[in-house]
UniProtKB/Swiss-Prot annotation:
Annotated source species: Colwellia psychrerythraea (strain 34H / ATCC BAA-681) (Vibrio psychroerythus)
Gene giving rise to this polypeptide: serS
UniProt domain comment: Consists of two distinct domains, a catalytic core and a N-terminal extension that is involved in tRNA binding.
EC number of the protein: 6.1.1.11
GO biological process: selenocysteine biosynthetic process; seryl-tRNA aminoacylation
Gene3D superfamilies for this protein: Bira Bifunctional Protein, Domain 2 (3.30.930.10), Serine-tRNA synthetase, tRNA binding domain (1.10.287.40)
Binding site for ATP: 264-266, 351-354
GO cellular component labels: cytoplasm
UniProt GO MF annotations: ATP binding; serine-tRNA ligase activity
Protein name: Serine--tRNA ligase
Keyword Magnesium included in the entry's annotation: no
Lineage of origin: Bacteria, Pseudomonadati, Pseudomonadota, Gammaproteobacteria, Alteromonadales
Coiled coil residues, start to end: none
C-alpha cells in the first residue's frame, strides 16, 4: 500500500507516476472522499468538544440546584449525533481504503518504460542452447515415455485439467530438483529453511497484495465460519511472518526459503499453455524471501536474483535475465527481474523465476517494522521475494535440454547424488 500521507498531499504526482503502469487513478473520486473525510473529521471534533463542554455544565447546573433534564437531553442528542458522524467517517474511510488497496506500488526510477512484456529489457544471457542432431521432443512426450512418469490423463481423472500425476524416476527427479535447490540456498546462500502452512487467512493475503484485487486467482475454502485460501506462493506465509512485528535492526537481513506446493486458479490465462507442466493449478516452487533495511533493498534484489541464476548455472541450463518494463511489473513490486530458461521444444526462453523488490509496499500493509538503532524509532521494512526456482518448470527444462536420441534423459551432474547415482533415466 502507498503512503496515505502521499496520497493526500501529492495525489497528482502519484497519478502521473502510475500512468507508467497503464494504471489510471481516479483522482477526482479520491479527492472528493478526502475532502468529505476532512469535513466529517472537523464536525466530529466539534461535536466531541461541545459534548464535553455540556457534560461539564451539567455538574455545575446540578450544584446550583437547576433543572438538568434539558441539559441531559441535549448531551444525549450530541452523543447520538457524534455516533452518526463517526459511522459516516468510518464509511468514508472504508471507501478511501478500498481505492487505496487497489493502487499498485510506485515503480523504481530505474525501471524502463514500456507497455507489456514485449518491451522488457534483456540484461544478461548465459549458456548456449544445445544443437540437436535428432528431432526434439517436448517434455510431455519425454516424461510419459519414462515409465509414464508424467501422466496428465490420470491427473485429469483425479482432479481435472492442469493437473498431473508423476511416478517413478520422474517423480524422484522432481523431488531431487527441490532438494538440490533448498540445499544450495541454505548451505551456500545463507537462507533459513522454513516449513509453512499451505492454507492462509485473508489478512496474510492482504499483507502481500493478493487481496482484495486478485481474489479470483486463488482457491478458497469455506469451512463453517472459517475461511482460508490455498497459497499461490510461499511468499505469502514467509513474508507475513513479520506482520505486526517490530524486528530488531541487528536481526536484519532475514533470509528465508521454503519448498511448497502452490495453487493458482489461472483465471486470466484463457487457453494458454494447456499442454504440459508450464501452467498448472498445482505446482511446486522453492521460494526465497528477504526482509531488509530500506537502504539495502536494491542490493538485496541483485543478490536474490543472482541466487536464482546460480541454480540454473549449476544445472547447466541456458537462460537469460530480463528487467521488466513499467507495464509488466507486478502489482506489489517496485522493480523486477525475470529469469527465462531455454526450452528446445518451444525454441524460446520461458519464465522460470521472478525476483522482485517490493520496497515498503507490503510492509505498510502488514505494519512490519524494525527498530532503528540510532533513533530507537520503528521504521517500515523492505521486503523482497523470488523463485529459486519453480520446480515443475525446472523439470521441463531438464527433460528437454538433457534428452537423448533414444528418448532417455541424462541426469544433470549436480542432481546425481540426489538420484542415488543415476546418470540417465529412461
Amino acid at each position: 500500500m502507498l503512503d496515505a500521507k502521499l496520497l493526500r498531499t501529492d495525489l497528482d504526482n502519484i497519478a502521473q507516476q502510475l500512468t507508467k503502469r497503464n494504471f489510471v487513478l481516479d483522482t477526482e473520486a479520491l479527492s472528493a472522499l478526502e475532502e468529505l473525510r476532512k469535513a466529517i473529521q472537523v464536525k466530529t471534533q466539534e461535536l466531541q468538544n461541545e459534548r464535553n463542554t455540556r457534560s461539564k455544565s451539567i455538574g455545575q447546573a446540578k450544584a446550583r440546584g437547576e433543572d438538568i433534564a434539558p441539559l441531559l437531553a441535549h448531551v444525549s442528542q450530541l452523543g447520538n449525533d457524534l455516533d452518526a458522524a463517526k459511522t459516516e467517517q468510518d464509511e468514508v474511510l472504508a471507501k478511501i481504503d478500498a481505492i487505496a488497496s487497489a493502487i499498485p506500488n510506485l515503480l523504481d526510477d530505474s525501471v524502463p518504460e514500456g507497455k507489456d512484456e514485449d518491451d522488457n529489457v534483456e540484461v544478461k544471457r548465459w549458456g548456449t542452447p544445445r544443437e540437436f542432431d535428432f528431432e526434439v521432443k517436448d517434455h510431455v512426450d519425454l516424461g510419459f515415455s519414462v515409465d509414464k512418469g508424467l501422466d496428465f490423463e490420470s491427473g485429469a481423472k483425479l482432479a481435472g485439467t492442469r493437473f498431473v500425476v508423476m511416478r517413478g524416476k520422474i517423480a524422484r527427479l522432481h523431488r531431487a530438483i527441490a532438494q538440490f535447490m533448498l540445499d544450495t540456498h541454505t548451505e551456500e546462500h545463507g537462507y533459513q529453511e522454513m516449513y509453512v502452512p499451505y492454507l492462509v487467512n485473508a489478512a496474510s493475503l492482504y499483507g502481500t497484495g493478493q487481496l482484495p484485487k486478485f481474489g479470483e486467482d486463488l482457491f478458497h475454502t469455506d469451512l463453517s465460519n472459517k475461511k482460508f485460501s490455498l497459497i499461490p506462493t510461499s511468499e505469502v506465509p514467509l513474508t507475513n511472518l513479520v506482520r505486526d512485528e517490530i524486528v530488531d535492526e541487528d536481526d536484519l537481513p532475514i533470509k528465508m526459503t521454503a519448498h511448497t506446493p502452490c495453487f493458482r486458479s489461472e483465471a486470466g490465462s484463457g487457453g494458454r499453455d494447456i499442454r504440459g507442466l508450464i501452467r498448472q493449478h498445482q505446482f511446486d516452487k522453492v521460494e526465497m524471501v528477504q526482509i531488509v533495511k530500506p537502504e539495502t533493498s536494491m542490493t538485496a534484489l541483485d543478490e536474490l536474483t543472482r541466487h536464482a541464476e546460480i541454480i540454473l548455472e549449476k544445472l547447466e541450463l541456458p537462460y537469460r535475465t530480463v528487467q521488466l518494463c513499467s507495464g509488466d511489473v507486478g502489482f506489489s513490486a517496485a522493480k523486477t527481474f525475470d529469469l527465462e530458461v531455454w526450452l528446445p521444444a518451444q525454441d524460446t526462453y520461458r519464465e522460470i523465476s521472478s525476483c522482485s523488490n517490493m520496497g515498503a509496499f507490503q510492509a505498510r500493509r502488514m505494519q512490519a517494522r524494525f527498530r532503528n538503532n540510532e533513533t530507537n524509532k520503528p521504521e517500515l521494512l523492505h521486503t523482497l521475494n523470488g523463485s529459486g526456482l519453480a520446480v515443475g518448470r525446472t523439470l521441463v527444462a531438464i527433460l528437454e535440454n538433457y534428452q537423448q536420441a533414444d528418448g532417455s534423459i541424462n541426469v544433470p551432474t549436480v542432481l546425481q547424488p540426489y538420484m542415488g547415482g543415476l546418470t540417465n533415466i529412461g
